[in-house]
Amino acid sequence: MNNIIKMLNDEQMKQDVPAFGAGDTVVVQVRVKEGDKERLQAFEGVVIAKRNRGLHSAFTVRKISNGEGVERAFQTHSPLIASIEVKRRGRVRRAKLYYLRDRSGKSARIREKLATK
């Protein structure tokens, strides 16, 4: 029974998910259905949380839109996600960046992780 569940989970998991973590700026292309048309909607922001649970993995992205903070949680292996692109790597010392909710402006900045040789 356990092997069947593991096999089904492995079959449904996406293979093209890039490596990213908290503090990284990502662009998530989401499939949105409006009436009978389907289009891609981009959501760009900072990953403030990531949950690794195999097929049930999820991550939360936060962005500022018109001066208002917007957060959206995504299931990593959802068929509604067309692609995930990492724009910039952030250097943080926490796994969950919930403290960014209370900050704005310069105090909400995240240092960039420079590529190592």
UniProtKB/Swiss-Prot annotation:
The keyword Ion transport does not apply. Keywords: Ribonucleoprotein, Ribosomal protein. One of its GO terms (biological process) is translation. The keyword Ribonucleoprotein applies. Pfam families: Ribosomal_L19. GO terms for cellular component: cytosolic large ribosomal subunit. It comes from the Bacteria. Gene3D superfamilies: 2.30.30.790. GO terms for molecular function: structural constituent of ribosome. This protein is located at the 30S-50S ribosomal subunit interface and may play a role in the structure and function of the aminoacyl-tRNA binding site. Belongs to the bacterial ribosomal protein bL19 family. HAMAP family: Ribosomal_bL19. This is Large ribosomal subunit protein bL19. It comes from Shewanella baltica (strain OS155 / ATCC BAA-1091).
